[in-house]
Amino acid sequence: MFVGQYVEERSMKMRIAIGCLLASFAITAAAVAANPQAKLEPKPTFASVLDHQLSSTEKTVVPAAEAMPEDKYNFAPTQGEFKGVRTFAAEVKHMAVANFHLGAAILGEKVPVDTGNGPDGPAALTSKADILKFLNDSFVYAHKALNSINETNILEPVKSPFGPNMTTRLALAMSITGHPYDHYGQMVEYLRMNGIVPPASRK
């Protein structure tokens, strides 16, 4: 579904992703060795490291979605090179759609909600409240998916949700934590064009 909307992770990107996870474990292990009290802390797992990263992403993008007034949710620039770009609402719904599809692929199950017939989510979702619920629910589901990842299944082949190829849970997890930032940048532009400072940029 949505073939062409996403690109499969390449081997170099995979090596970088694995390297980042291993580096995180190494840093934590070094901290524990240097501080005996740290041994009382829970040992990090693949799931906990990935889930922490998703929480960081969520804490950045959700407040941005909340910051736009309802009467501006359908805002999109219409002139010059901006013509045809997604509205603010479509950006938010698109993030949620991706979260649901990536999460379902990690869990090996069908997407649990109606995500519409395209990458921008259900057309029936038009109010700010409904769109925010869709986004928040998608993050709840994404957290569930990441917490199912362990050292046994993290590199097992799984079907990509965006084409016929196979991928891994690690590749999907890196997408689910990083993909929202692709659209957060656009949301920031829309907020600032309407005189709103993004929450993450406020002092």
Feature map (PLM): residue ranges:
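Short, Lys/Arg-enriched N-terminal segments with co-localized hydrophobic residues
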Residues: M1-K13
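Acidic/histidine-rich alpha-helical segments that form the ligand environment
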Residues: P122-S160, T168-P180
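Acidic/histidine-rich, surface-exposed loop or edge segments in extracytoplasmic proteins
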Residues: Q37-F46, E109-A124
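Bacterial N-terminal signal peptides
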Residues: G19-A29
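Surface-exposed helix-capping loop/turn segments at secondary-structure junctions
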Residues: E66-F75, L146-L155, R192-P198
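Well-ordered alpha-helical scaffold segments within catalytic/enzyme domains
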Residues: T60, A64-A65, G103, Y141, ...
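Boundary at the C-terminal end of the N-terminal hydrophobic targeting segment
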Residues: A29-P36
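Short, contiguous alpha-helical
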Residues: D51, S55-V62, N74-P119, K159-K203
